[in-house]
């Protein structure tokens, strides 16, 4: 079994998603022998955002590529191959200003690649990366799971929809809310999230 574990929080040891994503990954390794783990810390080792130069390589012969285009094309290919090869993904994705960290968006922009992870057909787009399980580890300072709060959720819903576009339908969410609403609520939310992790079908 191949596990791809991504963290995107910029908060290092103060991060709730890092703490919880580590528990998910450890739980998977405890339940299954021979788990091959690939880990990317997208905050400590950020992936460059797409630029005109990077995308321009698609419209030029490889012999004309710049050094940056060559290195970034190689990185994109590596990220896509990691994604395709993984049986399970654990994604630590905190809510920042109602959305995801920019570091995670950079990763998504590399792996959402036409012709590799999805394709366009006469009947619309088709995802090319099925048969994967994703555990999305979410943390929010406030509460956004209710009807009103969900109107400001461009975090979980976005990630789930992008993954679905790529063909991934098996997504489970581990959520810790009210992290910024006092130490008691923070502790309770983390405790409940860990209980939910123990019940995951991994």
From Swiss-Prot:
Cofactor: how bound: Binds 1 FMN per subunit.
Gene3D superfamilies (UniProt xref): 3.40.50.360
GO molecular function, one term: electron transfer activity
Cofactor names: FMN
SUPFAM superfamilies according to UniProt: Flavoproteins
Binding site for FMN: 9, 95-98
Keywords, comma-separated and alphabetical: Flavoprotein, FMN, NAD, Oxidoreductase
Enzyme class at the top of the EC tree: oxidoreductase
EC number annotated for this UniProt entry: 1.6.5.-, 1.7.1.17
Catalytic activity: 2 a quinone + NADH + H(+) = 2 a 1,4-benzosemiquinone + NAD(+); N,N-dimethyl-1,4-phenylenediamine + anthranilate + 2 NAD(+) = 2-(4-dimethylaminophenyl)diazenylbenzoate + 2 NADH + 2 H(+)
Subunit (UniProt): Homodimer.
Family: Belongs to the azoreductase type 1 family.
Free-text function comment from the UniProt entry: Quinone reductase that provides resistance to thiol-specific stress caused by electrophilic quinones. Also exhibits azoreductase activity. Catalyzes the reductive cleavage of the azo bond in aromatic azo compounds to the corresponding amines.
Protein name: FMN-dependent NADH:quinone oxidoreductase
Species, as recorded: Chromobacterium violaceum (strain ATCC 12472 / DSM 30191 / JCM 1249 / CCUG 213 / NBRC 12614 / NCIMB 9131 / NCTC 9757 / MK)
């Amino acid at each position: 079994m191949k596990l791809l574990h991504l963290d995107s929080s910029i908060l290092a040891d103060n991060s709730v998603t890092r703490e919880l994503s580590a528990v998910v990954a450890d739980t998977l390794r405890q339940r299954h022998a021979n788990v091959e783990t690939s880990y990317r810390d997208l905050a400590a080792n950020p992936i460059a955002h797409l630029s005109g130069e990077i995308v321009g390589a698609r419209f030029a012969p490889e012999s004309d590529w710049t050094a940056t285009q060559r290195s970034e094309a190689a990185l994109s290919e590596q990220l896509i191959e990691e994604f395709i090869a993984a049986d399970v993904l654990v994604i630590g994705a905190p809510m920042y200003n109602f959305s995801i960290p920019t570091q995670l968006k950079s990763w998504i922009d590399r792996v959402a690649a036409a012709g590799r992870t999805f394709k366009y057909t006469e009947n619309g787009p088709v995802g090319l990366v099925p048969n994967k399980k994703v555990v999305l580890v979410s943390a929010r300072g406030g509460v956004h799971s209710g009807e009103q709060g969900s109107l400001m959720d461009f975090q979980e819903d976005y990630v789930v929809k992008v993954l679905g576009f790529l063909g991934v339908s098996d997504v489970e969410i581990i959520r810790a809310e009210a992290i910024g609403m006092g130490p008691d609520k923070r502790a309770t939310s983390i405790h409940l999230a860990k209980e939910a992790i123990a019940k995951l079908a991994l």
